[in-house]
Amino acid sequence: MIIFPAIDIIDGKPVRLFKGDFATAEQVADDVLETANGFVQAGAEWVHMVDLDGSLKKERVNSQTFVDVAAQTPLKVEIGGGIRTMADIDFYANNGISRVILGSVALKNPALVEQAVKEFGELIAVGIDAKNGFVATEGWTEGSDTHYIDLAKQMEAMGVKT
């Protein structure tokens, strides 16, 4: 089994949210790289990282932090949050990131997901957040009328594997 320890980031610091609620953000460590190295020492091969600032601002905010973890640890890094364009995906693909997770854009711009899968293959994953069975977007701040299973089936039909 592959365990994916996670580091969510707000203002460059590792945090945890309770049920995706930004009002519950609690800093859990002083340094992202130190946290990642702790996961290495515990035997992790992957780390799941989320740019929570990016998810709210709808753009890459903490991207250099992700790149630093990929460059300075042996971890495979999968990232999500604030990824809205092919240029964002290309940036990560060319800077050592092992997997790019598309979230809100999967619902709001499925054509971009389809293009990304064609260009980058299994580097692309789709993360679907759901509240009460329906897709939630923009860092859990917006709801939708789309059932999460329907979106998952649509993504699978486009060639998304993860």
What are the residue ranges of the model-derived segments?
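Alpha-helix-loop-beta-strand connector modules within alpha/beta enzyme cores
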Residues: 5, 57-80, 112-129
